[in-house]
Amino acid sequence: MEDSKPLSVSEVTRIIKNLISGSKDLKNIWVRGEISNYSKASSGHIYFSLKDAGSLIRCTFFNYSNKNYSGKPLSDGKEIQVYGTITLYEAGGSYNLNVTRVEELGQGDILLQIEKLKQKLAVEGIFDPEKKRRIPSFPKTLGIATSPTGAAIEDIIKISRSRFPGINILIAPCIVQGEDAPDSIVAAIEELNHPNWKVDVIIAGRGGGSFEDLMAFNDEKVVRAYANSRIPIISAVGHQTDVLLSDFAADHFTPTPTAAAEYAIPKEEDVLQFLSQLEGRIKSSLVTKISSNRDRLRLLSGKFIFKEPMQLLNQRSQRVDEIGIRLQKALSNKLNLARVRLERYQNLTSRIQNILFHKKQKAEFWTSKVEDLSPAATMKRGYSILRNENGKIIRSPEETKPEEELQVLLSGGTMQVIRKGK
């Protein structure tokens, strides 16, 4: 035997508890098996064991967790899967599975499909808070989409009438459970959206039920109908679960049809009190406005314009006449100035024309002089120009040779000549 100090039972139990509580593998786990030793205490806690072919584990389903369970009743021999954490019961020295959620086998696959649909619709913005429509404070007509025979319709009508007897109620009956339920719910919502009915708010839902009973309100068509409704929708499905997609798509959701009616319909006495307060505020505002206008009228009545209106009008008329005379005089001065400028421009034009005429005569005279001095004019008077065969102008006989062929340029043309003699 070793010399180490022996541990007490409590110490060993505490070590085991710490090991269990510190293990991530034993927290938030799913366990499947068959129910045995099922019992429910007066406190509401449920105790049972889960077993398979080789082992058994004790489970505790506390009241605060099992009150949200809406599935079929639990009983011995039923196959389920549970979600929870392993804990150690120190007094008994036994470990236990503290259950927070129970699902029937096969339900987990459905939940996975619902979660995928939820993510898909969330990406599309179906659940966006900014798209939620405001629930009217004082609806005149309430539309109800639910089963015409269930307790939900009775609760909604009873509460609505008790709160506001004058409320108009329009019922669009529909199937709320089974394969035909989704299409029936969609048709009811679309009918209540028809403009002829003038519905202000819709309550859509049903009383409580099992997980399978509520599946219609997780259907994609129903969720889209909620989101696409022109009229605000309050979701009212009893025993609300955390996977009911229609609740997320609705403009507001409540845990029961009764709560939906209480939220949608104001109490008549509250409405009357509001109207009374509103009437008081309107009267107070009118009194203040009238008093303010009376003071303003009194102030204006003391002004000159209201005391001697004709005198003020005569002054304004005289002022207009003075302005008219000034305008007429200014216009006359403008016209005279323009007339003087026009005459000045006309005289200037005449002077320019005379100058141009004299300039033209001088130009013609000098042109004639220049033409008289040109070679062509000189040759017309009998002169000629003599060139050698290279085109050089001959100015004296010494510049030519005997028998040299020369060109004579006359006024009428040219001719060839030959020099004779020395």
From Swiss-Prot:
InterPro entries: Exonuc_VII_L, Exonuc_VII_lsu_C, OB-fold_nuc-bd_dom
Enzyme class, spelled out: hydrolase
Coiled-coil residue spans: none
Protein location: Cytoplasm
Catalytic activity reported: Exonucleolytic cleavage in either 5'- to 3'- or 3'- to 5'-direction to yield nucleoside 5'-phosphates
Main location: cytoplasm
Biological process annotations from GO: DNA catabolic process
Cellular component, GO annotation: cytoplasm; exodeoxyribonuclease VII complex
Keyword vocabulary terms for this entry: Cytoplasm, Exonuclease, Hydrolase, Nuclease
Its EC number(s): 3.1.11.6
Molecular-function GO terms, alphabetical: exodeoxyribonuclease VII activity; nucleic acid binding
Task performed by this protein: Bidirectionally degrades single-stranded DNA into large acid-insoluble oligonucleotides, which are then degraded further into small acid-soluble oligonucleotides.
HAMAP family per record: Exonuc_7_L (MF_00378)
Family named by the database record: Belongs to the XseA family.
Subunit-structure text: Heterooligomer composed of large and small subunits.
Name of this chain's protein: Exodeoxyribonuclease 7 large subunit
Organism in which the protein naturally occurs: Leptospira interrogans serogroup Icterohaemorrhagiae serovar copenhageni (strain Fiocruz L1-130)
